[in-house]
């Protein structure tokens, strides 16, 4: 386990320590030898002839036994030095925290404030601030170098293997290279096809990249509500989610202590954190959408920019003219943010202030390099409503807004549905690429059927794998509690593992050069009956081992050449190994008692001659075979 600070004063508690048979290793980019890019190395059975396998690691220092974990102090603010050495920023006092930031919570319900305080920074003047601006200027930042090294997962330049994987896949027009270089990262960001969500105030961040020419990423949602959860639970859920592979986390808190909860999460988050600012703005006006104002919303944006939120979901595509298009839907408007803005538009009979003030929002977000996640407030909430005019009208508007944000220097990704049956998924990806200039797509699922409450992690995992294959850059997880309640810790893990499967399956299908290395390693371990390696190479070693041990719990069973499904006599892999062993002895006279070692080859040659003598045809008359056999 990690070295812990004083456990009596550490609040909240989080899960630490490495995953089974794993250790933290670091890769150093040639272009920046001062950077240490984390990987997880899975240690395989000694003597098995298998090298240890490096895999992508999202867990931050929480799985590094050498690191002191103190959630009260937060993670090291390493990236601030990178930001400052580039220049073009100023440090300032920042906005004063107000009672309404935490829902005017009383002292008896107030959460403990995060003690460490850091002055925020912001961009000044016309010098590049955002990763997009640096990329367009031809400047490769440390963040770009970092993510390039990270995407290669510690591989050396195994060009032949990489090219074979690319050839085997179907990428639907993606431009995945055999190897990721910092220059390739820069060019993808400059074109708007990828983003590195990295607020300059989130100095604890380990940068990552989102784009269809990179590994498919997943997001996990956490957050309190008016009825349940606490700061402690949400920080623990964040750490738990990244332990199992969440690439980003969205804090969707809607209850008390929103500002404080977010501060605790950000200061302890090595991954990008996203939010939906309209949720907190609504809390500041007593939950009444009609009372929302542009000034209140803008103040909330400033608050969250200064804290270090990396990307905002902003439902600026929910326009007054589109609301009537949802009238005949089965499930209407299901997005919380979308319904809030729809009610505001109808109550005031005005165009959305998110749409009319969009350029001002861009100017503000640019100063902090906060990325847009343009929200799909009119997404379908049932397969009956999939691909309707309301959904696609909003998507077309998001394409217009993308162009505005790019001109302002802001990074952009686009949110997508929702509930879409399998045969209607690809058109969503194709239309998004066309309308939004290939900006990264980020979808919730989509759920492919509506008949499985309690199993929507599966209904959506199917759609997620498909749309990831078609080109979606990031998949937002769905847990078993979707439509039913707030997910707990176990639900978070189930959702993350489900979506890691979907993301990995899509990478395999696209032909990502590094994707199949882990599959092949696990397959070899399975055939060799290296049970421990099978467990440890899987996405969830604990569950795999627990399932195996339900019926074969003894340590001796972990070297047995069978499992409880087939038993020792009917194991297909054991039988195959026996056949291979037997075949290997056929040319050994001592093993099978043959008069000489060439007997097997002579027999094969005789049968080959017979085939050619009969005309070399696969199918022949039965009588001719009988006559031929008489001659033998």
UniProtKB/Swiss-Prot annotation:
Keywords: 4Fe-4S, Iron, Iron-sulfur, Lyase, Metal-binding, S-adenosyl-L-methionine, Thiamine biosynthesis, Zinc
Biased composition (Polar residues): 1-13
Cofactor note: Binds 1 [4Fe-4S] cluster per subunit. The cluster is coordinated with 3 cysteines and an exchangeable S-adenosyl-L-methionine.
Enzyme Commission number(s): 4.1.99.17
Known catalytic reactions: 5-amino-1-(5-phospho-beta-D-ribosyl)imidazole + S-adenosyl-L-methionine = 4-amino-2-methyl-5-(phosphooxymethyl)pyrimidine + CO + 5'-deoxyadenosine + formate + L-methionine + 3 H(+)
Gene3D superfamilies the UniProt entry points to: 6.10.250.620, Radical SAM ThiC family, central domain
Pathway(s) where this gene product acts: Cofactor biosynthesis; thiamine diphosphate biosynthesis
Pfam families: ThiC-associated, ThiC_Rad_SAM
Co-factor(s): [4Fe-4S] cluster
Binding site residues for Zn(2+): 419, 483
Gene Ontology biological-process entries: thiamine biosynthetic process; thiamine diphosphate biosynthetic process
Family membership noted in the UniProt record: Belongs to the ThiC family.
Record's protein name: Phosphomethylpyrimidine synthase
Organism name: Afipia carboxidovorans (strain ATCC 49405 / DSM 1227 / KCTC 32145 / OM5)
Lineage, opening ranks: Bacteria, Pseudomonadati, Pseudomonadota, Alphaproteobacteria, Hyphomicrobiales
Name of the coding gene: thiC
